[in-house]
Amino acid sequence: MKLHSLISVLLLFVTLIPKGKTGVIPGQKQCIALKGVCRDKLCSTLDDTIGICNEGKKCCRRWWILEPYPTPVPKGKSP
């Protein structure tokens, strides 16, 4: 009887616990760290493309920022 009540309590907790939400997409996280903005497909003429957020979105940042934040050199992929 104890096993039956234990299973029912565990089942109740599993149904009540909300599912975890995923975090920020890695490309968006890197774009935010570089002080950029994710934009659809194209950056404006005042922006420089510094990366890709996800499919169809590019990471853009103003190229004339008074206090420039260095863009890291991408690491090469090993064959």
From Swiss-Prot:
Keyword Signal: yes
Tissue specificity field: Expressed on differentiated macrophage phagocytizing plasmodium falciparum-parasitized erythrocytes.
Disulfide bonds: 38-53, 43-60
Subcellular localization, as worded in the UniProt entry: Secreted
Signal peptide bounds: 1-22
Family: Belongs to the beta-defensin family.
Function: Antimicrobial host-defense peptide. Has an antiplasmodial activity.
Stated name of the protein: Beta-defensin 130B
Highest taxon of the lineage: Eukaryota
Pfam families: Defensin_beta (PF00711)
PANTHER family: BETA-DEFENSIN, BETA-DEFENSIN 130A-RELATED
The UniProt record lists the keyword Disulfide bond: yes
InterPro entries reported in the protein's UniProt record: Defensin_beta-like (IPR001855)
A GO CC term assigned to this protein in UniProt: extracellular space
